[in-house]
Amino acid sequence: MVLYKIRRSKNDPCPSIPSAVIIGYSVGLKLITGHGAQSLSNMAGSYAGKELGIYAMNNGYEFKDIKDIERFLNQLDFAKIEMNEEEDEIIVKISKCNLCPKRICGYEFEGTACPWGGLLIGFISETLKYNLGYQMNLKPAETCIIKLKKK
């Protein structure tokens, strides 16, 4: 297998160590799985979100509602996150994403390898005990919208 065959068109470094790790992992998934990268990113992201929720709660963070989660996630500086809860769904707008391989590093590949859908489900399920499904409208390097449906 030839390593590094997905082209990186920007020379800018990632903004943080977690960003570098997640972007590298996402691009590697894309290289290995092709079109299955988004499904694997969703699954891996859900476990990452669960573990992040456990970590946060064990370190004194309290989550009573979606706005508490929005504040916490914005503190991580992974992206600009806006969350609004309606009756049966949570609408999440993600912009200025520091986890996007296309936006940050200029990686050029078809499709997506975004951890946000899974990460949000894992985190919210762990902290608020919601049972969620999702629908994603991903626009790499722009604003992505994820609708989390309450089950």
From Swiss-Prot:
InterPro entries: NO_sig/Golgi_transp_ligand-bd (IPR024096). This is Uncharacterized protein MJ0207.
